[in-house]
Amino acid sequence: MSLRIWIAAGTTEGRLLAEDLADENVELAVTVATEYGASLIIDKPNVSVLDKRLNDRGMAEFIDQFKPDLAIDATHPYAAMVTETMRRVCEKKGVVYKRLLRPPTDEE
């Protein structure tokens, strides 16, 4: 059985992580906030993409359906509300949560 990984992507790093992991023996679910973001995610049989903003309830339902072993938060550095919600929901659901964080740039 392959590892099931949820990537909440909102940065280039999230997209690149999905591309790297797509070649491994894993099942990926990538969530993004927009249709444009979804269009940037690699198209492979082991990668599913959901373009929808998720609140607490939406994240909990997503976890119940996908059943990830690991959740990686690769959202934008300024998306503090999304990060806190994801961390809290993962803790409640018993899903390992990791934050992939790049420093914000002056242009952002």
Model-assigned labels for residue ranges:
Residues 29-53, 108:
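N-terminal beta-loop-helix "entrance" segment that forms/cooperates
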Residues 60-108:
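Glycine/small-residue-rich loop that forms an oxyanion/phosphate-binding "nest" at active or ligand-binding sites
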Residues 20-23, 43-46, 85-88:
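Short, glycine/charged-enriched secondary-structure capping and boundary segments
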Residues 12, 16, 20-21, 39, ...:
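N-terminal glycine-rich FAD/FM-binding segment characteristic of electron-transfer flavoproteins
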